[in-house]
């Protein structure tokens, strides 16, 4: 069901039993020769435009930092993980029930499953994708078939009117402002869709009539133009909104520029550029009727570009378009990291650059050089504020990173490190002795869910950390280490209730359960949530085992490293040449956070329900990097965490001074489920306030203090949690109260240190030992 088309509260799928934890998902889960560098007029004669099927990878001409410096210190330079061999044989090989899309090579590269364009790969290929600021989809409407494009204004958003603040807002979808087709296309059955060069920030779509007759659409996040390149086909542009007027503004030796006014009063600019960059004066376009624009004749290689804004400076980018984005990064010092989106571009423009739009968190992180490339153009995004236009072939950014974040308890936002009195250590020891001696991690984790088993294992891993590094109790540590390693062995040998498989179709580690089990893990939902708990457990076991055995005898790590890194490669593969897993399956570098939805089509695009478990996924990678001595891995995780802090505080977690989200919505304090096209202040498992808020807090670790500021916690507590805390009598209460350690550690510690503490207040992934150790460290 596509909720975004109706101006009524979108229903939230129920999870059975009113469980206070995340339960089984609804059905279905989460419904729903080389390219030329873009040349400038002052450069030599431009090269011929590339033909489809050739590599999209060429260096960008715009590179404000020295390439030699970036490449030599590039934290993304392969190899990051030293062993990219086939997944362990314990994983059975299976074919995925979701067929692979029509791609140019059916056997070589792993396919992305959680990226902005995945919607278009599924079912009948008609679900929208969001490159931001545009939405794009394939229309099979018999009257208006082809590739449709649209941009929505903030004024078009639909807000819930039944609650204050509104529970949701969404943008209307499937408004066919423009539909690209060719005069030779008689019906949608004539069109063959082909998907090429599918990377984690870009892909290329072909609408083909034959091998020589096709329209090519490079789709790159943040692209300023919707670009179509016509190969031996006649240009035709249609609109369901309707064309009110078509005006030729100018025709020069490089391009033709036209103003198109739609019947909804929106004005768009159309640029037409010939492949030899010498625009023929006899080439004309005209209105055939109020829904159709056609050309006088065809030009093989005609570049057609639509812009939703009309500021004159956009002319400087006309004829140039991005086709691929390369990611690079460099550690500046212990506090900051630079990172760059380096766009490979094709075509020719007056400025030598293309047009790109940046989200607010990009703009906030831009280096001073980026200010010179900013133009007076801004377009609304769907759910992430106002985007700003730049004439550029790269985004150059710098963010603060949590270099000091490691295993030990810290409160980064309070600038506090652990300090325990003897009284507190005694209280922590009392809890630890009870939880270790009465525990059975092997039995507790013997369940049919990688998510819930991971939470349980990580709970005991943090107890293990406390017994060894805070209590310094070797006997207690050895007792729990033995239990925990036995529990982990079930998963490492793949003997759990629902074993994992290796999917040879899309290429990844998936559950053997059905699409409705374990939150849709078998369809690539939530992998970063699920597997990160296991990675954290492995990191802590490795750390403690190494300490007990001696630095030179870290046998547990070496014996199990391939299995752990297989999970990391699945949800956050860091090497672009890994033949078994896609790069960064879950994490979206343009949006600055992960997407939880996998191979399920959705009318509102990808979504994310838990910012805190997203943080946990990168925290897990950092901890594994620390324990294995992999500095590149820790640097990448630090960068992700640095980006996430800005992103979550802008788009997901709302302090009263938030200026990015609509002012009428920030009173919710948290997003709930954030989709690409809407925000719904809800969860997939219930509507209780503690569910909606604390799914963005769980699990509380040192990493929580990096993202959740004391002021945010204060506002959320006073406005949302304090009024209901006395009515919460289950595991969510413990999460709420440990979350308070980020604001008032003493208040939190006093709650957990009560002599008659009720353990029913602990979530199944939360221990009293860790709750006392974390809150007591700073009180």
Curated annotation (Swiss-Prot):
Q: Where is this region: beta-sandwich subdomain?
A: 73-309
How its function is modulated: the record gives: Inhibited by mercury ions.
Its EC number is 3.2.1.39
Q: What are the temperature characteristics of this protein's activity?
A: Optimum temperature is 55 degrees Celsius.
Residues of the region (Sufficient for catalytic activity) are 375-779
Q: Where is the composition biased (Polar residues)?
A: 57-71
Q: What is its main location?
A: cytoplasm
Region alpha/beta subdomain, as annotated, extends over: 309-400
Quote the subcellular location field of this record: Cytoplasm
Q: Indicate the residues that form the catalytic site.
A: 526, 609, 613
GO cellular component terms, semicolon-separated: cell surface; cytoplasm
Question: What more does the record tell us?
Answer: Present with 1420 molecules/cell in log phase SD medium.
Q: What does it do? A: Cleaves internal linkages in 1,3-beta-glucan.
Family membership noted in the UniProt record:
Belongs to the glycosyl hydrolase 81 family.
Q: What is this protein called in UniProt? A: Glucan endo-1,3-beta-D-glucosidase 2
What is the species listed in this Swiss-Prot or TrEMBL entry? Saccharomyces cerevisiae (strain ATCC 204508 / S288c)
């Amino acid at each position: 069901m596509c909720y975004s088309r109706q101006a009524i509260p979108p229903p939230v799928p129920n999870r059975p039993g009113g469980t206070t934890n995340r339960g089984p998902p609804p059905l279905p889960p989460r419904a729903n020769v080389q390219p030329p560098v873009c040349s400038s007029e002052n450069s030599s004669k431009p090269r011929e435009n590339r033909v489809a099927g050739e590599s999209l990878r060429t260096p960008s001409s715009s590179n404000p930092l020295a390439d030699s410096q970036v490449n030599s210190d590039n934290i993304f330079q392969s190899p990051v993980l030293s062993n990219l061999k086939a997944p362990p044989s314990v994983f059975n090989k299976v074919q995925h029930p979701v067929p692979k899309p029509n791609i140019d090579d059916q056997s070589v590269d792993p396919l992305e499953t959680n990226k902005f364009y995945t919607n278009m790969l599924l079912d009948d290929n008609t679900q929208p994708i969001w490159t931001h600021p545009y939405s794009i989809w394939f229309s099979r409407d018999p009257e208006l078939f082809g590739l449709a494009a649209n941009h929505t204004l903030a004024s078009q958003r639909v807000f819930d009117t039944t609650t204050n603040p509104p529970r949701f807002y969404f943008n209307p979808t499937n408004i066919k402002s423009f539909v690209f087709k060719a005069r030779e296309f008689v019906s949608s059955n004539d069109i063959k869709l082909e998907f090429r060069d599918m990377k984690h920030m870009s892909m290329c779509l072909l609408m083909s009539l034959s091998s020589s007759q096709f329209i090519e659409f490079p789709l790159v996040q943040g692209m300023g133009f919707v670009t179509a390149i016509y190969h031996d086909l006649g240009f035709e542009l249609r609109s369901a909104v309707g064309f009110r007027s078509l005006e030729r503004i100018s025709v020069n030796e490089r391009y033709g520029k036209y103003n198109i006014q739609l019947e909804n009063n929106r004005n768009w600019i159309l640029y037409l550029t010939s492949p030899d960059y010498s625009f023929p004066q006899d080439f004309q376009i005209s209105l055939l009727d109020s829904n159709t624009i056609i050309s006088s004749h065809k030009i093989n290689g005609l570049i057609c570009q639509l812009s939703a804004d009309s500021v004159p400076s956009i002319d400087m980018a006309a004829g140039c378009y991005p086709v691929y984005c390369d990611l690079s990064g460099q550690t500046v010092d212990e506090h900051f990291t630079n990172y760059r989106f380096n766009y490979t571009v094709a075509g020719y423009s007056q400025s030598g650059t293309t047009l790109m739009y940046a989200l607010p968190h990009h703009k906030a992180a831009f280096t001073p050089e980026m200010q010179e490339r900013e133009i007076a153009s801004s377009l609304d995004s769907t759910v992430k504020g106002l985007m700003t236009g730049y004439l550029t072939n790269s985004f150059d950014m710098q963010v603060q990173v949590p270099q000091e974040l490691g295993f030990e308890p810290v409160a980064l936002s309070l600038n506090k490190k652990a300090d325990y009195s003897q009284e507190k250590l005694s209280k922590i020891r009392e809890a630890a002795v009870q939880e270790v001696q009465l525990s059975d991690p092997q039995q507790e984790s013997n369940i049919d869910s990688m998510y819930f088993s991971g939470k349980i294992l990580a709970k005991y891993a943090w107890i293990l950390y406390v017994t060894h590094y805070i209590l310094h109790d070797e006997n207690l540590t050895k007792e729990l280490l033995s239990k925990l390693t036995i529990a982990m062995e079930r998963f490492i040998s793949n003997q759990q209730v629902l074993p994992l498989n290796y999917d040879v179709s899309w290429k990844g580690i998936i559950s053997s359960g059905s699409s409705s089990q374990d939150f849709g893990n078998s369809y690539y939902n939530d992998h970063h949530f699920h597997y990160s708990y296991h990675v954290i457990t492995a990191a802590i076991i490795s750390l403690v085992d190494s300490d007990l055995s001696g630095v030179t005898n870290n046998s547990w790590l070496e014996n199990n490293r391939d299995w752990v890194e297989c999970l990391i490669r699945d949800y956050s593969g860091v090497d672009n040449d890994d033949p078994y897993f896609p790069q960064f399956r879950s994490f979206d570098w343009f949006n600055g956070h992960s997407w939880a939805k996998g191979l399920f089509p959705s009318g509102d695009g990808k979504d994310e329900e838990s910012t805190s478990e997203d943080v946990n996924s990168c925290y897990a990678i950092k901890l594994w990097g620390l324990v294995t001595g992999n500095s590149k891995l820790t640097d990448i995780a630090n960068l992700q965490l640095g980006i996430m802090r800005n992103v979550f505080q802008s788009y997901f977690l709302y302090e009263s001074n938030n200026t990015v989200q609509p002012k009428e919505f920030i009173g919710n304090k948290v997003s709930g489920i954030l989709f690409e096209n809407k925000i719904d202040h809800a969860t997939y498992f219930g509507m209780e306030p503690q569910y909606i808020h604390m799914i963005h807090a769980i699990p509380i670790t040192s990493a929580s203090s990096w993202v959740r500021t004391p002021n945010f916690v204060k506002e959320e507590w006073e406005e949302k949690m304090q009024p209901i805390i006395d009515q919460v009598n289950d595991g969510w209460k413990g999460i709420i109260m440990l979350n308070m350690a980020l604001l008032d550690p003493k208040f939190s510690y006093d709650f957990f240190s009560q002599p008659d503490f009720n353990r029913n207040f602990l979530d199944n992934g939360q221990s009293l030992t860790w709750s006392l150790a974390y809150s007591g460290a700073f009180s």
